[in-house]
Amino acid sequence: MPTLTANGIRIAFDTAGDPKAVPILLVHGLGMQLTAWPDEFVEGLVELGFYVIRFDNRDCGLSTKFEQAGAPNLALAWLKSKLGWRLRSAYRLEDMADDALGVLSALGVARAHVVGVSMGAMIGQILAARHPQRVLSLTSIMSSSGRRGLPGPTPQARKALMRRPADPTDIDSILEQWVTLLRTIGSPSYPTPEKLLRRRVARSLRRSYCPGGVLRQMMAVAAAGDRSELLRSIAVPTLVIHGAADPLVPLACGLDTAAQIPGARLEVIEGMGHDLPPQLIERLLALIDAHARGKMLPDSTPRLFVKQ
């Protein structure tokens, strides 16, 4: 896996397609490596004529880890957030956005379409707001503005997210913990086949496992707080996609994200949770392609994709 130096750290990356084609940068979410992007999704973008760039966020995969910062106390952070106190983190989402920008610069890419998922969409939002000259368009999937008062995860999703492996030294226990989490937050109407889910998790764990990095990324998200003002400054064409059945980042968060970004287009997908299930890849590719090529209808009425 190739690496590059950006923003003072090592970042693992991968590219697919013709470097002369229109570039599209994929930014994944909490604890998710670049290999978590479904192969058919990446291949589909290449077939549509894009030059696909994906990378491991800091503290994840094969990119630089920040173990020297230690593991944050999430319980204490939650209490502080409830009291309205300012949270400190090992790094900020702004730093992660600078990482993404550094990847583009290191690869000689002047401008790119940006597609972000969950935390990755938050990073994409910051990138689009702070560096609009480098972003052709933004697609924000299953994410949030961080505005106070928005609903949080369901009890089941929160429990699965905070659950630790029965034996943190046993790879099978770790695999079961991740499979349980992904199954819990996944799309109820479009479940990922069990064998495929386990194969993906096993591949990820063989490549890298950094639980401390997940916690530090969670702190970066928590410390970011309300980004509504930043979202209102985004001027690049923006598409917001959200699942109506998302238990981790509820639909209200996606609706608010679209409402905050001027001119944003909203697509709500019925039965979709907090994942990119095989059954929806074709639909997601069509939406992203139409948005990137400026072929979406100009109205701002939310569109609902209902399972046939």
Task: For the regions a language model picked out, list residue spans one by one.
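Conserved HGGG/HGGXW glycine-rich cap/lid loop of the alpha/beta-hydrolase fold
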Residues: 9-83
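Conserved acidic catalytic loop of the alpha/beta-hydrolase fold
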Residues: 87, 94-112
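Flexible "cap/lid" loop of the alpha/beta hydrolase fold
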Residues: 138-168
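Conserved alpha/beta-hydrolase catalytic His-Asp/Glu region
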Residues: 172-215
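Short beta-strand/loop motif that positions the catalytic acidic residue
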Residues: 234, 240-242
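Catalytic active-site module of serine/aspartate enzymes centered on a nucleophile-bearing elbow/loop
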Residues: 264-308
